[in-house]
């Protein structure tokens, strides 16, 4: 990686939530952030739930987001890779964004090495012990048959229904009302601990686990690794940046360190 370049990570934009006007303001804020990243970006990782709902019908996609989609295309046209992970809200992302915006779609956990550091990146949904009801639902909705059946629902009805269900989601609530449950209760923290124990040889253990989904800004030291959660953009606007030496959680637009909600400050390793 070039000494002047950086890798950026963000998640949980939830574009489309809770209404057109509020979403548009958030979209413009995200575009400002992307334009800030572009001149110095080695790569940009968008780690799930970028859209509050997304479905690609045979001849149509959801209205809106044209500024955001155009910005993605402009960035990839410059040769800067954008890696997009589907989340639980936009798990039906398919090849439209690949063909029209040039993004690289990554559906599973992604591991990579940069400057001697190993990264493990995933949206975070369905990882760790428990949450069996969601894991079953994810398998059902991920099936081709589910997509096939949904496409026969008129878009006006299907998209409206999806947004209505989303507004009832616990994660649509203000994260200030939520809190970190501790390393022994948080599914993603448990996943990191279990994954670290399963990796052999030790030199293959990730240094950084980067997730979204939880809607909390987290920087947790677990054994030899750091677990970072990227926060959200519904009420906040946080992101992570790796400069080849250190990985930091920052707040946009101040670019100041984001306060970790597990009461642990950002640590450079």
Task: Tell where the protein language model's regions lie, with residue ranges.
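Short, well-ordered, mixed-charge alpha-helical segments that flank or form enzyme active sites
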Residues: 91-95, 121-122, 128-131
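Structural motif
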Residues: 114-115, 222
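Short, basic, low-complexity termini and linkers enriched in Ser/Thr/Gly/Pro
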Residues: 258-269
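Active-site metal-binding loops of divalent metal-dependent hydrolases
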Residues: 11-14, 49-50, 88-89, 124-125, ...
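Short hydrophobic-aromatic micro-motifs
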Residues: 9, 118-122, 228-229
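Conserved beta-sheet core of the metallophosphoesterase superfamily
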Residues: 102-107, 125, 130-137, 141-144, ...
């Amino acid at each position: 990686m070039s000494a002047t370049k950086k890798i950026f990570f963000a998640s949980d934009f939830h574009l489309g939530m809770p209404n057109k006007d509020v979403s548009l303001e958030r979209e413009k804020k995200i575009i400002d952030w992307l334009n800030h990243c572009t001149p110095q970006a080695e790569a940009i990782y968008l780690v799930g739930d970028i859209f509050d709902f997304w479905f690609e019908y045979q001849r149509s996609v959801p209205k809106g987001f044209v500024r955001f989609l155009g910005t993605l295309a402009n960035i990839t046209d410059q040769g800067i890779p954008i890696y997009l992970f589907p989340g639980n809200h936009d798990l039906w992302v398919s090849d439209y964004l690949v063909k029209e915006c040039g993004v690289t779609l990554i559906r599973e956990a992604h591991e990579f090495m940069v400057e001697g550091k190993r990264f493990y990146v995933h949206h975070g949904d369905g990882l760790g012990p428990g949450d069996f009801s969601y894991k079953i639902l994810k398998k059902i909705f991920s099936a081709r048959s589910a997509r096939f059946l949904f496409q026969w629902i008129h878009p006006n009805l299907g998209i409206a229904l999806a947004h209505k269900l989303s507004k009832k989601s616990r994660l649509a609530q203000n994260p200030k009302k939520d809190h970190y449950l501790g390393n022994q209760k948080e599914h993603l923290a448990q996943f990191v601990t279990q994954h670290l124990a399963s990796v052999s040889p030790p030199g293959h253990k990730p240094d950084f686990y980067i997730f979204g989904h939880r809607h909390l800004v987290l920087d947790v030291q677990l054994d030899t690794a750091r677990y970072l959660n990227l926060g959200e953009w519904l009420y906040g606007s946080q992101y992570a940046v790796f400069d080849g030496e250190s990985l930091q959680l920052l707040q946009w637009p101040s670019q100041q360190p984001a306060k970790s909600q597990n009461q642990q400050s950002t640590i450079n390793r």
